[in-house]
């Protein structure tokens, strides 16, 4: 399996200053470094990736589909009219925009998604703060599989879907031995946390979403990592084997054993030693 990770060194200096927009404005704007960074991403893919892809109308259509999937793969927020407008505007034009270092289409689509998501989550919280009728058995059929559902044809259809979905979620929690009040409080907390996460999304998140929509066209194992994502990746890697009884850290491109914890599984086995470098992880009998 070929894995190709692109690290955004150019953005590392500016990411610390990225601020999430206020919920009221619901606008995320890319800065002047992002087009340059995106050009570097395309150059890296063209020069180093084994898959060669032309920036043409086929690429444009794929990119639009992948980006919309990343934004709202569950078909929870966009309306059919939003999708149709996006396809009309950008299906055959994203490639032309990228050739001109124009990331405004990504900005436009991301902010529309953000606007729809914030409005929907706020509406869900408002609904949950009033008593919701639990659906009767005959009325509980709801299709959660986005592949089997169409986009909402109207705000009214979206409202009806979400009212039923919230009632289903409440019912599910009550079946798990929550009282109606406890279920209501728990769901409100979940949606408030979700609202906070969306409010905190910033230009780095926008850029990463669009960049990864591009890299996914090349292959599913090609990823763009922002400096923050790279840091989280390193943290996760450094902690991934601590359960075996060893303290680990990232050293250059390898995970290195800092020390073996006395009495732990690694100490009992006697194979792993301090300063060993871990180049792969596998189950017993597997090739690494």
Predicted stretch roles:
Residues 1-9:
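Bacterial N-terminal signal peptides
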């Amino acid at each position: 399996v070929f894995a190709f990770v692109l690290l955004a060194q150019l953005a590392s200096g500016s990411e610390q200053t990225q601020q999430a927009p206020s919920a009221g404005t619901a606008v995320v704007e890319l800065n002047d470094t992002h087009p340059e960074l995106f050009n570097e991403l395309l150059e890296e893919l063209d020069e180093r990736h084994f898959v060669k892809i032309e920036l043409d109308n086929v690429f444009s259509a794929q990119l639009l589909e992948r980006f919309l999937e990343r934004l709202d793969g569950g078909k929870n927020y966009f309306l059919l009219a939003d999708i149709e407008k996006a396809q009309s505007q950008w299906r055959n034009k994203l490639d032309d925009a990228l050739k001109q270092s124009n990331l405004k289409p990504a900005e436009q689509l991301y902010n529309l998604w953000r606007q729809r998501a914030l409005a929907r989550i706020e509406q869900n919280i408002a609904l949950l703060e009033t008593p919701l009728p639990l659906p009767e058995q005959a009325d509980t059929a709801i299709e959660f599989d986005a592949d089997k559902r169409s986009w909402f044809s109207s705000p009214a259809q979206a409202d009806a879907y979400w009212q039923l979905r919230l009632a289903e979620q409440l019912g599910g929690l009550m079946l798990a031995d929550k009282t109606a009040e406890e279920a209501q409080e728990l769901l409100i907390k979940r949606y408030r946390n979700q609202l906070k996460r969306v409010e905190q999304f910033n230009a780095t998140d926008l850029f990463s979403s669009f960049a990864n929509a591009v890299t996914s066209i090349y292959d599913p194992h090609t990823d763009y990592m922002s400096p923050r994502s790279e840091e989280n990746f390193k943290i996760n890697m450094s902690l991934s084997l601590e359960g075996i009884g060893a303290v680990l850290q990232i050293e250059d491109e390898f995970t290195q054993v800092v020390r073996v914890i006395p009495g732990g599984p690694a100490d009992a086995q006697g194979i792993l030693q301090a300063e060993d470098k871990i180049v792969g992880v596998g189950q017993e009998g597997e090739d690494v």
